[in-house]
Amino acid sequence: KDGAVYFSGLYENGLLKGVAPKDFCCWRYWGKSSTACFLGGIRLRGADPASFRVLNYAYAMDKTAVYTTSGRIPDVELAAFQVLDNGQNDSGAPQGYAKDSRQVYFHNGDGKVKIIKGAEVSSFRSLGDTYFARDEKRIYAYGKQLSKAELTSWELLGHWYSRDAKRVYYLNREIKGADRDSFT
């Protein structure tokens, strides 16, 4: 209406200075013009608008870096980087798993992206809900290994609960005393 571009965020709203509406496109938290890239109302320093692309709710990248809603991920192998889910948890917040050829990443929307140590990159996959993942040897919940989980019998129950032949879990915590057989 007034020839300006505004953003509307959870905690604040504002004007994106120097951006023309005809030159601006956005997707959820991410935006770009021919001269700059944005996360909400924040200009992403050093981001390249010509190569910038949104990968999912939680991740975006350009020719030099991968970005999350918490900032850049250092030392990413850009050519091999891939997101493993839609990047949005069930409450609508940006969250999800990604990997390159060397390591696996988990972004929960609050702070730095976690590198999942010990994950088998080649077989690692998200189970689609942005909370749970697995590789050939382990189960992961919220970016952490379920160290006691028995891989062959583990199953996801829903609403952040899972179980194996011996235990019941809520995200990455064992629920002591829970009866595995009657817990559904």
Predicted features, each with a name:
Residues 1-184:
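Non-catalytic tandem-repeat scaffold regions and their flanking low-complexity/translocation tails
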